[in-house]
């Protein structure tokens, strides 16, 4: 409200879905009464915060996603979860046997998540560039500043969970990843109607930030993805090798979203993707004749 509006992509999505709900939540700031309990929605928040803490601890210990050993990964996960829980809800998670079980569940989900994210990175050439990038203070970003009229301006704020990049000559290829605990699939119809703006806003901001931080380089979009944080069950058969089980897990943990339909970019994201194959790490597949599948 006012002549200079400051909103997040989520707020704009809420307004597009229901203007009255937007008014109640962001105008009147109505919210549910907080209770001393740990609900299912809190589980997603804790996992998200623990994953952010893991990224910080990884950097602090001067480790990389690619070089991280299983032992180092598990130790960092335990540390990150304990640090997150200590700061969450005045130790609410330590208040009952049920919540103690939830701590173990968070650690299990996070182990599966970090393992899958490692495999996705190892499949291609991209490297994580930045984590938890806030662009609310970037006043001069064209991607987050819009002149609505002579006197009115809209400034978007937000935080990108992760930006990956691959540099070749004078070009920086960029993909953004947003961690989700629900099953919000990217839907182009929802994008068209303004109900899913987050990934597009984040990708545009990431491209502009990369060019700003690397003068003389040109940033190109490679993809925008949701990663669903979960620990899925897979159908197995007696005698299945560990490699086959991991393949099924990766299929279930594949990112969802849009990838740029260019052979070079697809190959740089998944070097094993070729004619007649479906990627285990990105939403792309080739027909036997080498054309992109309609499922891509």
Identify the role of each PLM range:
Residues 1-296:
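Structural signature of nuclease core domains in nucleic-acid processing machines
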């Amino acid at each position: 409200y006012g002549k200079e509006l400051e909103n997040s992509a989520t707020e704009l999505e809420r307004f597009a879905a229901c203007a009255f709900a937007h008014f109640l939540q962001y105008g009147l700031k109505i919210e549910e009464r907080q209770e001393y309990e740990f609900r299912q929605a809190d589980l997603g928040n804790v996992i998200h915060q623990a994953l952010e803490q893991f990224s910080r601890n990884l950097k602090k210990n001067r480790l990389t996603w690619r070089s991280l050993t299983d032992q180092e990964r598990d130790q960092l996960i335990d540390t990150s979860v304990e640090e997150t829980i200590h700061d969450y809800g005045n130790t609410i998670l330590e208040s009952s046997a049920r919540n103690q079980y939830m701590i173990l569940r968070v650690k299990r989900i996070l182990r599966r998540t970090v393992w899958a994210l490692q495999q996705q990175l190892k499949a291609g050439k991209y490297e994580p560039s930045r984590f938890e990038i806030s662009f609310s203070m970037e006043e001069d970003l064209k991607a987050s500043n819009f002149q609505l009229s002579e006197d009115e301006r809209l400034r978007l704020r937000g935080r990108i969970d992760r930006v990956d990049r691959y540099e070749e000559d004078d070009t920086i290829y960029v993909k953004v990843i947003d961690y989700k605990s629900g099953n919000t699939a990217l839907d182009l119809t929802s994008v068209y109607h303004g109900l899913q703006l987050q990934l597009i806003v984040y990708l545009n901001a990431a491209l502009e930030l990369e060019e700003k931080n690397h003068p003389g380089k040109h940033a190109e979009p490679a993809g925008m993805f949701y990663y669903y944080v979960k620990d899925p069950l897979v159908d197995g058969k007696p005698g299945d090798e560990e490699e086959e089980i991991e393949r099924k897990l990766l299929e279930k943990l594949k990112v969802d979203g849009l990838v740029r339909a260019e052979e070079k970019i697809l190959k740089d994201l998944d070097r094993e993707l070729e004619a007649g194959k479906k990627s285990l790490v990105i939403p792309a597949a080739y027909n036997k004749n080498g054309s992109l599948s309609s499922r891509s």
